[in-house]
Protein backbone atom coordinates (compact mmCIF):
# COMPACT_ATOMS: atom_id res chain seq x y z
CA UNK A 1 0.00 0.00 0.00
CA UNK A 2 1.31 3.42 -0.93
CA UNK A 3 0.73 6.34 1.39
CA UNK A 4 0.79 9.86 0.04
CA UNK A 5 2.28 12.73 1.91
CA UNK A 6 -0.49 14.91 3.23
CA UNK A 7 0.12 18.63 3.41
CA UNK A 8 -1.87 20.49 6.00
CA UNK A 9 -0.90 23.87 4.57
CA UNK A 10 -3.82 25.46 2.78
CA UNK A 11 -2.83 27.64 -0.15
CA UNK A 12 -4.92 30.79 -0.04
CA UNK A 13 -7.25 31.39 -2.94
CA UNK A 14 -9.56 34.10 -4.19
CA UNK A 15 -12.63 34.16 -1.96
CA UNK A 16 -10.74 33.12 1.18
CA UNK A 17 -10.64 35.34 4.24
CA UNK A 18 -7.25 37.05 4.42
CA UNK A 19 -5.30 36.13 7.55
CA UNK A 20 -5.09 39.05 9.98
CA UNK A 21 -1.66 40.36 10.89
CA UNK A 22 -0.05 42.95 13.12
CA UNK A 23 3.37 43.87 11.72
CA UNK A 24 6.00 46.52 12.38
CA UNK A 25 6.52 49.02 9.58
CA UNK A 26 9.34 51.17 8.30
CA UNK A 27 7.31 54.28 9.16
CA UNK A 28 7.49 53.43 12.88
CA UNK A 29 3.91 52.18 13.12
CA UNK A 30 2.46 48.71 13.55
CA UNK A 31 -0.28 47.82 11.10
CA UNK A 32 -3.06 45.38 11.82
CA UNK A 33 -4.89 44.26 8.71
CA UNK A 34 -8.32 44.33 10.35
CA UNK A 35 -7.80 47.96 11.41
CA UNK A 36 -6.75 49.11 7.93
CA UNK A 37 -9.68 47.25 6.34
CA UNK A 38 -12.09 49.34 8.41
CA UNK A 39 -11.03 52.23 6.16
CA UNK A 40 -10.28 50.72 2.76
CA UNK A 41 -9.01 47.81 0.69
CA UNK A 42 -5.42 46.56 1.11
CA UNK A 43 -2.71 45.42 -1.28
CA UNK A 44 -0.06 43.26 0.39
CA UNK A 45 2.98 42.79 -1.87
CA UNK A 46 5.36 40.15 -0.51
CA UNK A 47 8.98 40.34 -1.65
CA UNK A 48 11.92 37.97 -1.04
CA UNK A 49 14.77 40.12 0.36
CA UNK A 50 15.49 43.79 0.94
CA UNK A 51 18.31 45.01 -1.27
CA UNK A 52 18.21 42.30 -3.91
CA UNK A 53 17.83 43.22 -7.59
CA UNK A 54 14.19 42.30 -8.23
CA UNK A 55 13.04 43.67 -4.87
CA UNK A 56 14.85 46.95 -5.48
CA UNK A 57 13.22 47.26 -8.91
CA UNK A 58 9.77 46.60 -7.40
CA UNK A 59 10.29 49.08 -4.56
CA UNK A 60 11.50 51.76 -6.98
CA UNK A 61 8.47 51.15 -9.21
CA UNK A 62 6.16 51.82 -6.27
CA UNK A 63 8.21 54.79 -5.04
CA UNK A 64 8.42 56.44 -8.47
CA UNK A 65 4.92 55.59 -9.72
CA UNK A 66 2.98 55.41 -6.46
CA UNK A 67 1.06 58.50 -7.56
CA UNK A 68 -0.95 56.13 -9.76
CA UNK A 69 -2.27 54.49 -6.58
CA UNK A 70 -2.86 57.57 -4.42
CA UNK A 71 -6.34 58.27 -5.82
CA UNK A 72 -7.56 54.69 -5.32
CA UNK A 73 -9.20 53.79 -2.00
CA UNK A 74 -6.60 51.18 -1.05
CA UNK A 75 -3.60 51.04 1.24
CA UNK A 76 -0.59 49.22 -0.18
CA UNK A 77 2.30 47.62 1.63
CA UNK A 78 5.39 45.72 0.64
CA UNK A 79 6.21 42.94 3.13
CA UNK A 80 9.11 40.58 3.76
CA UNK A 81 10.57 38.38 6.47
CA UNK A 82 13.55 40.73 6.77
CA UNK A 83 14.27 42.38 10.13
CA UNK A 84 12.74 45.87 10.45
CA UNK A 85 16.21 47.45 10.42
CA UNK A 86 16.98 45.94 7.00
CA UNK A 87 13.65 47.12 5.61
CA UNK A 88 14.18 50.63 7.01
CA UNK A 89 17.53 50.95 5.23
CA UNK A 90 15.99 49.47 2.06
CA UNK A 91 13.05 51.92 2.20
CA UNK A 92 15.37 54.90 2.69
CA UNK A 93 17.72 53.83 -0.12
CA UNK A 94 14.76 53.58 -2.53
CA UNK A 95 12.84 56.67 -1.36
CA UNK A 96 9.83 54.53 -0.45
CA UNK A 97 6.99 56.82 0.65
CA UNK A 98 4.83 53.86 1.68
CA UNK A 99 5.22 51.35 4.51
CA UNK A 100 7.32 48.21 4.23
CA UNK A 101 6.23 45.58 6.74
CA UNK A 102 8.58 43.20 8.53
CA UNK A 103 7.65 39.66 9.52
CA UNK A 104 10.86 38.37 11.14
CA UNK A 105 9.04 35.49 12.88
CA UNK A 106 7.79 34.39 9.43
CA UNK A 107 4.37 33.55 10.91
CA UNK A 108 2.41 35.92 8.66
CA UNK A 109 4.35 34.66 5.62
CA UNK A 110 3.34 31.12 6.62
CA UNK A 111 -0.28 32.24 7.09
CA UNK A 112 -0.26 33.66 3.55
CA UNK A 113 1.52 30.54 2.24
CA UNK A 114 4.34 32.60 0.73
CA UNK A 115 7.24 31.24 2.79
CA UNK A 116 9.67 29.50 0.44
CA UNK A 117 12.26 27.00 1.63
CA UNK A 118 11.47 28.18 5.15
CA UNK A 119 13.50 31.37 4.92
CA UNK A 120 12.23 33.91 2.37
CA UNK A 121 8.92 35.12 0.97
CA UNK A 122 7.73 34.40 -2.56
CA UNK A 123 6.97 37.49 -4.66
CA UNK A 124 3.16 37.31 -4.48
CA UNK A 125 0.73 40.22 -4.20
CA UNK A 126 -2.62 39.90 -2.42
CA UNK A 127 -5.55 42.22 -3.15
CA UNK A 128 -7.88 42.25 -0.15
CA UNK A 129 -11.35 43.82 -0.15
CA UNK A 130 -12.69 45.93 2.72
CA UNK A 131 -14.65 42.87 3.83
CA UNK A 132 -11.35 41.02 4.41
CA UNK A 133 -11.83 38.63 1.49
CA UNK A 134 -9.02 38.00 -0.99
CA UNK A 135 -10.10 39.47 -4.33
CA UNK A 136 -7.05 38.48 -6.38
CA UNK A 137 -3.61 36.92 -5.92
CA UNK A 138 -0.85 37.87 -8.35
CA UNK A 139 1.66 35.03 -8.34
CA UNK A 140 3.49 36.36 -11.41
CA UNK A 141 4.47 39.86 -10.28
CA UNK A 142 6.48 41.99 -12.71
CA UNK A 143 8.75 44.12 -10.49
CA UNK A 144 9.38 46.72 -13.24
CA UNK A 145 5.70 47.63 -13.54
CA UNK A 146 4.49 46.86 -10.05
CA UNK A 147 2.82 50.23 -9.43
CA UNK A 148 1.13 50.34 -12.82
CA UNK A 149 -0.06 46.74 -12.49
CA UNK A 150 -1.43 47.37 -8.98
CA UNK A 151 -3.34 50.46 -10.10
CA UNK A 152 -4.85 48.64 -13.09
CA UNK A 153 -5.80 45.59 -11.02
CA UNK A 154 -7.43 47.70 -8.28
CA UNK A 155 -9.51 49.52 -10.90
CA UNK A 156 -10.38 46.21 -12.62
CA UNK A 157 -11.50 44.84 -9.23
CA UNK A 158 -13.84 47.81 -8.79
CA UNK A 159 -12.00 49.45 -5.90
CA UNK A 160 -13.38 53.00 -5.84
CA UNK A 161 -11.48 56.25 -6.14
CA UNK A 162 -10.79 58.20 -2.96
CA UNK A 163 -13.21 60.96 -2.10
CA UNK A 164 -12.80 63.61 0.57
CA UNK A 165 -15.92 62.41 2.38
CA UNK A 166 -14.95 58.73 2.35
CA UNK A 167 -11.19 59.04 2.83
CA UNK A 168 -10.39 59.25 6.51
CA UNK A 169 -6.66 59.53 5.82
CA UNK A 170 -6.47 61.90 2.85
CA UNK A 171 -3.68 64.06 4.25
CA UNK A 172 -1.44 61.09 5.07
CA UNK A 173 -2.74 57.78 3.73
CA UNK A 174 -0.25 55.84 5.85
CA UNK A 175 -0.95 57.27 9.27
CA UNK A 176 -2.83 54.98 11.57
Predicted segments with their positions:
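N-terminal "domain-start" segment that seeds a small globular fold
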Residues: 8-34, 155
Amino acid sequence: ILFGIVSYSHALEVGDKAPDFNLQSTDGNKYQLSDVLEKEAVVLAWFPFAGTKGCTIECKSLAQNGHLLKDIAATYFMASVDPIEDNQVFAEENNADFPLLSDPTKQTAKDYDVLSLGWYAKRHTFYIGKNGVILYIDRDVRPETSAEDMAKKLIDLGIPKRTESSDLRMANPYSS
